């Protein structure tokens, strides 16, 4: 993940590092620490992970998971930890967080829907259906 990002941002890192944020610079630098063989090994493992998980989509159009450890923070300074979406991003699967529930102080509590690789149209249809279904049941 960080190696991909590091590769994508190399030009900006080399030419305009002073214009990048501290966290982005740190992530780019972490990504630069991996060799090409380590990167290839990780990509192979990622593909194996997807193949072992893809059987789920033979029977289901999507998987519902938590989107976070709790309700959203007030304001927009922090959007939350990516820990609940990282595994799906890692496997190349589409995911979306839907604010279907509410928690403390009436703040949204996201539900994450995960779809199959290269099946985005169906995935978006399922997300739309799920959101409407939950609102209809309120």
Residue ranges and their predicted role:
Residues 34, 39-44, 90-138:
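Structural helix-boundary/capping segments
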Residues 2, 6, 81-84, 127:
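Amphipathic alpha-helical segments in well-structured domains
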Residues 52-54, 79-99:
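Small-aliphatic-rich amphipathic alpha-helix that forms the alpha element of a beta-alpha
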